[in-house]
Structure formats: structure tokens, C-alpha cells
Amino acid sequence: MQLSDLNKYCDKALESYATHAQPIYPGTVVTAPWVRLKCQYGCGGYGKRYGCPPDTPTPEQTQAVIDCYQRAILFHIESIPGSKEKGGRRVLKFFDMLVDLEGEMFKDGYYKALLFLAGPCHLCKECAKGKGEPCLHGDRARPAMEAVGIDVYQTVRNNGFFIETLKEKGDPKNLYALMLVD
């Protein structure tokens, strides 16, 4: 199987909201135990949403899943605070498009297509987990790369994409999503 077989899906993402999309080898995806600790100590969403730790796979489980794949796609979107995005709606539409793309890839025969997004889930204003109820959007909810222990910074850099820590609140954000394919 060729990485180039995935170009049509990259093109679809680029036609929608993606800034960049590139087929990659899963061996370039880095997992590490410290990543999950950054969620636990530093993110207010820890334990409050089904898409956040501790309700997500561990880095070790994630690495075992990644090892089952030969190809993947890395997607990038630049989010500029204060732009015409109206509170990040463009980013949310991007994530929604990627979930649809995952379904399309499944229908095209990529039955192992598996998507990881960025940041905490925002499908509901208030996650049903807080009420002890099941996820209301289990068909569309996807965990973030960082929530499953993927070192987004190193993974992105391994594949020639740009990323750096934010220096100021108003700095452009570079958000990434990962689709494991086969």
C-alpha cells in the first residue's frame, strides 16, 4: 500500500478547512507517559469528559493500537484568536468534517480508519459524564491525541510540520488531528 493512495482524502480536507494534510507513517507518531500527566495537571477538563483521561486509552494502549497500522494522515488547521472564526466555529467544523471523512474512508474499504482530534470534546455544552449518564454523541466523539498519550509536538515535528508553544494568549494556534488508516 502506498501513502499516495491517501492523497484524495488529504485533498478533501484541504478543500474544506485544513491548512495542511499529509500522509505519514505511524512509526513517526510518538507516545509518552508524561503527555497524559499534562492533561491531569494543567487541564481543567481532566476527568470531566468522556474524551479526556482517565476515560481514554493509556499511552501504552495507544502505542499498541498505532503498531497495528501502516499508514496515517496528519491534518493541520491554524486557528487565529479574534479572527472571523466566531469562537472557534471553524475549528469545530473542521473536526466535524474529519469525523465524516473517517466514515467515508470506512465506506471506501479502510475499515480500520481511526481518528484522534485535538483538545477536549466540545460536542455538548455540558458532558453527560458529570450527570453519570452515557455519552450523548458516542458516534461522533473522538479523543484528542494528547488525551491518549500522543506527543503532538514531537509527532508533528517528525513529519515536517510547524508547531511551537504559545507565548501569548492571542498567538495563532496550530491544531493537529491524526487519522490512522490501515
Segments and roles (model prediction):
Residues 10:
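Short alpha-helix
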